[in-house]
């Protein structure tokens, strides 16, 4: 197989679903992200390793990080996205792909939903769209999904979307405060049998 420099790989954007417009992060997203992090802090601090200190997520700090993320997107090192509700334009979900292996054509996906938009199916819709996009637009062979033990919301989405349970890595996830949690691993290798969803890019 001929190796292609990842920088030259086309990543068509945005991704559209019936309720979401999912796009790369852009200049000016920092304040909006800081607001969503503050709103959702209790849940993020429970599950996300990066949610260690609340005072670290200022609008300025988030804008700086946004611009680093934009550079990573151009270099194809990471794909961090924001999902906006199609009808209102409100940002409701932060999602994307990480641990991308372009040569092996595999990656992991993940997300978090701001508190005011939870329990409305946005995570399931976005995860479905991202899996379809990974296989259809990015040519991935494997899409992984992991979560910490006890994160039942993520487990239910993995099951609902037909991600195969691959096993448990004991104590592999580090949570805020240095706590360790078992990592539950799921994966898909194609979109066969996934719930129907209209996705365009």
Where are the regions a protein language model picked out?
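Acyl-donor (CoA/ACP) binding surface of acyl/acetyltransferases
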Residues: 1-32, 36-46, 80-201
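Generic, well-ordered alpha-helical segments
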Residues: 25, 36, 54-62, 75
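Conserved GNAT-fold acetyl-CoA-binding loop/helix
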Residues: 43-67
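A short helix-loop-beta-strand connector motif used in the catalytic cores of GNAT acetyltransferases and
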Residues: 53-54, 67-82
């Amino acid at each position: 197989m001929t190796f292609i420099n990842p920088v030259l790989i086309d990543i068509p954007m945005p991704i559209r679903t019936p309720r979401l417009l999912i796009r790369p992060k852009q200049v000016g997203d920092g304040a909006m992200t800081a607001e969503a992090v503050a709103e959702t802090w209790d849940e993020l601090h429970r599950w996300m390793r990066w949610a260690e200190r609340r005072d670290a997520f200022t609008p300025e700090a988030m804008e700086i990080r946004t611009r680093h993320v934009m550079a990573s997107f151009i270099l194809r090192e990471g794909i961090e996205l924001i999902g906006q509700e199609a009808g209102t334009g409100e940002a409701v979900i932060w999602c994307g792909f990480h641990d991308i292996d372009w040569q092996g054509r595999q990656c992991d996906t993940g997300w978090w939903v701001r508190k005011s938009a939870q329990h409305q199916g946005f995570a399931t819709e976005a995860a479905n769209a991202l899996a379809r996009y990974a296989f259809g637009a990015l040519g991935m062979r494997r899409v992984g999904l992991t979560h910490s033990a006890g994160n039942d919301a993520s487990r239910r989405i993995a099951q609902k979307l037909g991600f195969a349970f691959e096993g448990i890595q004991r104590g592999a996830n580090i949570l805020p405060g240095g706590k360790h949690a078992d990592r539950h691993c799921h994966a898909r290798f194609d979109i066969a049998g996934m719930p129907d969803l209209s996705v365009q890019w």
